[in-house]
Amino acid sequence: MKEVIAIIRPNTVSKTVKALDVVGFPAVTMAECFGRGKQKGYFSANLPEIVDIQKIIEEGEKEGRFIKYIPKRLISIVVDDADVPLVVGIISKVNRTGSFGDGRIFVLPVEEAIRVRTGETGEIAIGN
């Protein structure tokens, strides 16, 4: 089993989750997060529109601050090893614009999974 963690733009979460669901991966965990990459928090006019991001930039500029961290979303999904290329491919396809800020995907090993409700373990517990 592997955990696929994706850090993506907030405005692509719905499309990403829907695309994963369509191919049989409905179970995901999501969290709000903030970060920055090579662009170091600077925004470009050619980046896709992100909800409320312009307001955040304007407030930061008024106060003489630069944007240290950009709002992102973290999606985590645990899948069988054989499903990793499919899941990574879907996340990449939905989120790739070719611009800074498209995100990152990490693939980590999972030693064990336990479904608390039933006590099931291993691949049965992830239910994909």
From Swiss-Prot:
Pfam family, one: P-II
Biological process per Gene Ontology, one example term: regulation of nitrogen utilization
Keywords attached to this entry: Nitrogen fixation, Transcription, Transcription regulation
UniProt xrefs under InterPro entries: N-reg_PII, N-reg_PII-like_a/b, N-reg_PII/ATP_PRibTrfase_C, N-reg_PII_CS
Record-level Gene Ontology MF annotations: ATP binding; enzyme regulator activity
Record carries keyword Hydrolase: no
Highest taxon of source: Archaea
GO cellular component: cytosol
UniProt family annotation: Belongs to the P(II) protein family.
Task of the protein: Could be involved in the regulation of nitrogen fixation.
Name of the protein: Nitrogen fixation nifHD region GlnB-like protein 2
UniProt source species: Methanothermococcus thermolithotrophicus
Name of the gene encoding the protein in the UniProt record: glnBB
